[in-house]
């Protein structure tokens, strides 16, 4: 089990269409508003880790009001979440209401008062609970004060503490890892002139505050991991950004997910980037699911007897559609059944070896059936890619995948034409 502690927020999205401006002010007139509710802040982190299959205790404070009850009910709906939520009559539940016109945010209304700080000590005293990681989600709403003493206890217990900070880093002294964004890095430390300068500034802060790692998020620029050993850059994939709300929470959850699965910190950073990318391509506050972080497998198949420019173009374009490109080729016996005894020209070992030389190809599999249906069912790829001599309804296994992509043929190139010229 992991513990998520911090400022829990109710995110409200009021959305509707707008076709005209108000005559009273230069603002859109929105009609037919629909309202949706999502967990935000530390509650969003918890929903993301729980959505990824991690048993998660969430510790926070809500007001004794309708919004607090609603937030608790949303959290309680996930069976991987254990609630440790307190209620107060002195402050209202923190609510962020976003007004959306045609999917564009035009205003945000925040309802909040500063909460008193909560501590980890009471959680450490819970009998029977053994936390592998503690995730601190600080939105600077009062719940998280200076927790260096608690972090010291956590370290003594062998618990790694990861912090998403919103205050000066001295408040998180003794944490295992802090994850500021670039703006926070510049505000609480100083603005670096280049990556080497960032390394020096970051390492000085790590030493000063007894923190092992600093993971700086750079938006579309990826992430930078700083430790006493140095600095490492991680690139982010190019994606169409729909909504950045809660993306930092999702990336933090992706990081914890990787660590909880026994992956290295660097491998977990890659998952954090992927989680953030998934979040920003979805509307509102997105909650991750386990399938979101698995490799997006692209699948294509064929004989690939005599490799030509058309094959190369298809493979290169297919690779761009996902994380891993798997190429399945017919065995020699399968080719003979389909194309006659004169084929293949190159045996299956030669064809597979040739395909493995292309950097865009991650895996080559030889299948012995007449079609790759059983293999597709086993691999569960997200996308099947075929050449332009197919239509989508002709593609074997199309009902097993999320998407079928047809790539236009490279004119003038085909194995049949090449063999015809040789025979002439």
Region spans (language model):
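Active-site metal-binding loops of divalent metal-dependent hydrolases
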Residues: 7-8, 139, 250, 303-304, ...
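Divalent-cation-assisted or electrostatically stabilized phosphate/pyrophosphate-binding catalytic cores
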Residues: 26-33
